């Protein structure tokens, strides 16, 4: 069975409340339930974590290194400047998919650059909460090619 660590970065716990015109009205718990449902359909075991702290995300990447076959991460604003998060994902050494609910390339200029994307298998953005489900599907296909 494929094992995936799903990491939600800063402010993602406020889904459904924070800027619903950008991030939608699906709340955080509903998103996690959708992820669990999709994972069950594909027989993928998932562990879901959220933190507003960069160091905690890095600790989880290191802690789950032996357990996880892949990581799905929405780094939030850390996408644009967190070289320590980037380095932790690189050290993970297995597939990483960067996800974003909004299309970061249709937003403010500072959001157009990701320091995470160069160390990721791929990036999925702009599909709302479905970005996470598409990432799970991509991981399933990656391991079942």
Swiss-Prot record:
Residue numbers annotated as active site: 23 (proton acceptor), 100 (proton donor)
Function: Catalyzes a trans-dehydration via an enolate intermediate.
GO biological process: amino acid biosynthetic process; aromatic amino acid family biosynthetic process; chorismate biosynthetic process; quinate catabolic process
Protein name (record): 3-dehydroquinate dehydratase
Family per similarity comment: Belongs to the type-II 3-dehydroquinase family.
Signal sequence, start to end: none
Pfam families registered for this protein in UniProt: DHquinase_II (PF01220)
GO molecular function: 3-dehydroquinate dehydratase activity
Residues where substrate binds: 74, 80, 87, 101-102, 111
Enzyme class, broadest EC rank: lyase
Membrane spanning stretches: none
Gene: aroQ
CDD domains: DHQase_II
Reactions performed catalytically: 3-dehydroquinate = 3-dehydroshikimate + H2O
EC number: 4.2.1.10
UniProt xrefs under InterPro entries: DHquinase_II (IPR001874), DHquinase_II_CS (IPR018509), DHquinase_II_sf (IPR036441)
Pathway given in the UniProt record: Metabolic intermediate biosynthesis; chorismate biosynthesis; chorismate from D-erythrose 4-phosphate and phosphoenolpyruvate: step 3/7
Subunit structure of this chain's protein: Homododecamer.
PANTHER family: CATABOLIC 3-DEHYDROQUINASE
Positions of the record's site feature: Transition state stabilizer: 18
Keyword set, alphabetical order: Amino-acid biosynthesis, Aromatic amino acid biosynthesis, Lyase
